[in-house]
């Protein structure tokens, strides 16, 4: 679809430097190179106040857009709330029905003038998202970078969030994965897993602590959830304890002091050999009523797993080590590296090897 984009750029003093505003400028010019003639871009900047630096301009006039980006300089305080309001106002003015209407916020998240509290910014963006304009948040800088705030803003704005620390990462997000970053194909996407108790006696979702939903929210179309872009994939790992297997993590509850322990009655099961059922709900980008899909899975008891699965498992293990999870077991950085090295056969762009370097760096810092 045709894109109506608004670059909302933080040019406050905290964004000074080649790895902040300098990298923002280089990143956005990568995106500009891929604009079509029918696409349009406006540029809004904010520091002590907000202003329109470039009115909505055709993608055919790339040089004009690049020049406006190159002219940006950093200095002053950070009126992020004012900038967000102006960016949404301009995006709504140039709204393309059936198009990709999106604000791209580039910042370190250090809002300190006007609407700057987490709650105030969340409420502002929750109101603005009703217009059908999506929000992509690109984070820059180290030290005072507010990662949690950026993630929350993206979630409230029906959008996505990425951290850009070098030009290679900018190229990945804004060029190689342009469709997944910029084009929403499904909104309010929800997943619900039902395990068969005759096959699984206990389970644990690894990660996603900030994305959990109540069971009843799965069928509630008023409940906000995640958006997915073109070519976007999502991976969720569950750790399970098969039925009949002894585990230290099952039934670790003290006996009641004032009541007799009563063995719970066994729930009747259907006798199904299915391991689980995956339930998916989603809405089309321009619709408000969700669709539901269900897919059962039978465990074939095989140990052959794909390289993608092994790599994702290595990433999950790495995450548990970084946060020193109580459930990390005997996992080590060496095990993460060994597992990831068995899954490098599908790494044309070198992202998996970059992950290996991150793990090796983390291991070195720990020592």
Which positions does each model-derived feature cover?
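Short aromatic-acidic-glycine turn motif
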Residues: 51-54, 197-204, 287-289
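Extracytoplasmic assembly/pore-lining segments of large envelope/extracellular complexes
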Residues: 181, 185-188, 193-204
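Exposed acidic/Ser/Thr-rich ligand/metal-binding surfaces
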Residues: 1-189, 216, 248-268, 346, ...
């Amino acid at each position: 679809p045709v894109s109506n984009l608004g670059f909302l750029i933080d040019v406050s003093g905290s964004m000074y430097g080649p790895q902040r505003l300098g990298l923002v400028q280089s990143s956005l010019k990568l995106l500009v190179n891929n604009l079509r003639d029918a696409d349009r871009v406006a540029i809004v900047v904010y520091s002590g106040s907000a202003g329109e630096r470039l009115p909505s301009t055709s993608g055919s006039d790339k040089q004009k857009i690049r020049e406006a980006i190159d002219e940006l300089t950093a200095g002053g305080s950070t009126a992020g709330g004012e900038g967000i309001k102006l960016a949404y106002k301009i995006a709504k003015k140039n709204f393309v029905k059936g198009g990709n209407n999106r604000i791209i916020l580039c910042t370190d998240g250090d809002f300190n003038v006007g609407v700057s509290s987490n709650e105030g910014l969340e409420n502002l963006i929750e109101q603005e998202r009703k217009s059908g304009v999506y929000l992509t948040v690109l984070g820059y800088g180290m030290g005072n970078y507010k990662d949690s705030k950026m993630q929350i803003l993206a979630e409230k704005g029906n959008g996505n969030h990425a951290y850009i620390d070098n030009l290679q990462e900018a190229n990945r997000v804004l060029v190689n994965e342009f469709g997944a970053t910029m084009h929403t194909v499904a909104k309010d996407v929800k997943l619900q897993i039902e395990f068969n108790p005759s096959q699984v006696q206990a389970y644990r979702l690894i990660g996603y602590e900030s994305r959990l939903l109540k069971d009843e929210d799965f069928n509630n179309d008023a409940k906000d959830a995640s958006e997915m872009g073109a070519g976007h994939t999502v991976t969720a790992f569950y750790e399970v304890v098969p039925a009949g297997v002894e585990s230290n993590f099952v039934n670790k509850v003290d006996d009641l002091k004032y009541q007799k322990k009563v063995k719970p009655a066994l729930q009747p099961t259907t006798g199904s050999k299915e391991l689980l059922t995956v339930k998916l709900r989603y809405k089309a980008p321009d619709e408000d009523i969700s669709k539901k899909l269900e897919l059962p899975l039978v465990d074939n008891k095989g140990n052959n797993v794909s390289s993608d699965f092994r790599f994702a498992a290595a990433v999950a293990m790495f995450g548990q080590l970084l946060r020193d999870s109580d459930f990390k077991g005997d996992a080590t950085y060496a095990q993460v590296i060994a597992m990831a090295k068995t899954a490098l056969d599908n790494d044309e762009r070198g992202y998996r090897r970059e992950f290996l370097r991150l793990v090796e760096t983390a291991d070195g810092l720990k020592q």
